[in-house]
């Protein structure tokens, strides 16, 4: 249960992160607006990405695994390490699929309802339904804090990127109850070949449940 709760909080983090926009950009100082444009350019320059991730919840629960993103196919995969039996996959159509092998359960969420367009859209344009709450610049990193424009009290996402060269290092999401989940990335590789089979979802109800 602990691992499943942890992963569901991460799912929320992914969904919120995907809603990035900057309808309040005009209120930012010009230097911070420039940072936002740099973040856009960084994500638009990525076609494929592979990274190890470490996920930490407010209660200290930890999970690790591998993240794969193929923006050419609008596909994503979060593969959790054992003993977790969690798989989160967006196969490149309308679905975001959450598979929990420990209880043989599959949940399908329309991407349109929990938009992953931030990472999977053809063009990353930070404009729309979420506002930049703050941009914090440090010598080697920059934080971009985001909230939902119409529901700023429902939580926030903070993206942390390295500078020179720019690279996504982590993101965290804090919900309305003050619970925070953080995802740290390591061993990041971009511009690599990713086999399309990595993003194929075979429904276990039709093809059988994987064996332990």
Residue ranges and their predicted role:
Residues 1-5:
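N-terminal secretory signal peptides that target proteins for export/translocation
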Residues 6-12, 16:
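N-terminal export leaders
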Residues 22-26:
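Sec/Tat signal peptide C-region and signal peptidase I cleavage site
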Residues 27-45:
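Short N-terminal segments immediately surrounding and downstream of signal-peptide cleavage
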Residues 41-60:
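A short, Trp-centered hydrophobic/proline-enriched beta-strand micro-motif
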Residues 46-48, 62-64, 73, 83, ...:
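Extracytoplasmic
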Residues 66-118, 181-182:
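An acidic-aromatic
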Residues 127-212:
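Gly/Pro-enriched, hydrophobic low-complexity segments
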């Amino acid at each position: 249960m602990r691992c499943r709760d942890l992963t569901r909080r991460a799912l929320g983090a992914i969904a919120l992160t995907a809603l990035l926009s900057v309808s309040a950009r005009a209120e930012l100082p010009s230097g911070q607006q420039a940072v936002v444009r740099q973040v856009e350019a960084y994500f638009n320059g990525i076609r494929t990405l592979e990274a190890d991730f470490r996920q930490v919840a407010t209660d200290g629960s930890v999970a690790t695994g591998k993240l794969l993103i193929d923006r050419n196919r609008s596909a994503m995969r979060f593969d959790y390490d054992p003993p977790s039996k969690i798989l989160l996959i967006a196969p490149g159509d309308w679905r975001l699929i959450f598979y929990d092998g420990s209880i043989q359960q599959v949940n399908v969420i329309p991407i349109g309802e929990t938009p992953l367009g931030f990472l999977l859209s053809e063009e990353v344009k930070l404009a729309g339904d979420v506002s930049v709450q703050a941009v914090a610049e440090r010598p080697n990193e920059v934080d971009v804090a985001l909230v939902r424009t119409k529901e700023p009290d429902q939580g926030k996402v903070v993206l942390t990127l390295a500078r020179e060269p720019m690279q996504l290092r982590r993101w965290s999401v804090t919900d309305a109850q003050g619970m925070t989940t953080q995802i740290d990335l390591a061993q990041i590789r971009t511009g690599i070949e990713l086999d399309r089979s990595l993003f194929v979802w075979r429904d276990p109800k039709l093809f059988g449940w994987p064996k332990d």
